[in-house]
């Protein structure tokens, strides 16, 4: 039995069916991945300077994280929010999709989490920029947490159109 919450109702609302197309989901995944790659590159670039944390880096970091919010909202609408809803609001099929995506990206998630730790430690030890090391670790750990979202959005087929004459 599923319980309809206001969050679940938003994700199930047909006004957002445009976000559930495969092309839209693919573009959202690519945009999120590119955004995180740019933030990682900016972090590594800032770490090569003597100053480290600069105003320009802070602006890039803030703008990137603010841009992430609408991108992830779009992605979440495309996958009906199956990772952000409680189990009680998902049907068996949605629960299965969620579990399958987690299972498929388990090893890459572990590798990215390990890279977050080792990359952050190596950056701090090599450059002395602790704040940037924390940013790098956060970004890689964040990407690890996004892998199930990306996997589901990328592999989920387009939803079948309901035939109004079939009723």
Where are these regions (language model features)?
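Cytosolic-side membrane-entry/anchor segment at the start of a transmembrane helix
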Residues: 1-36, 149-167
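Juxtamembrane loop-transmembrane helix junctions in multi-pass integral membrane proteins
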Residues: 16-23, 48-55, 97, 126-129, ...
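Alpha-helical transmembrane segments and their membrane-interface junctions
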Residues: 37-47, 109-128
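Hydrophobic alpha-helical membrane-embedded segments
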Residues: 49-77
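Hydrophobic alpha-helical transmembrane segments and immediately flanking/interface helices
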Residues: 56-61, 120-150
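Membrane-water interface of transmembrane alpha-helices
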Residues: 69-86, 151-156
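Juxtamembrane/interfacial segments around transmembrane helices
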Residues: 80-90, 109-119, 162-166
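Short membrane-interface loop/juxtamembrane segments of multi-pass integral membrane proteins
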Residues: 86-104
């Amino acid at each position: 039995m599923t319980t309809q919450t206001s969050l679940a109702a938003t994700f199930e609302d047909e006004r957002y069916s445009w976000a559930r197309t495969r092309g839209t989901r693919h573009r959202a995944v690519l945009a999120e991945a590119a955004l995180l790659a740019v933030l990682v590159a900016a972090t590594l670039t800032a770490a090569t300077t003597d100053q480290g944390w600069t105003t320009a880096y802070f602006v890039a970091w803030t703008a990137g994280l603010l841009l992430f919010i609408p991108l992830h909202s779009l992605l979440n609408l495309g996958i009906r929010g199956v990772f952000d809803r409680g189990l009680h609001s998902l049907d068996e099929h949605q629960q299965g999709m969620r579990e399958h995506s987690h299972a498929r990206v388990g090893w890459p998630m572990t590798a990215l989490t390990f890279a977050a730790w080792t990359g952050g430690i190596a950056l701090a030890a090599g450059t002395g920029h602790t704040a940037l090391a924390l940013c790098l670790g956060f970004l890689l750990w964040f990407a690890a947490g996004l892998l199930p979202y990306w996997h589901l959005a990328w592999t989920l087929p387009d939803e079948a159109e309901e035939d109004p004459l079939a009723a």
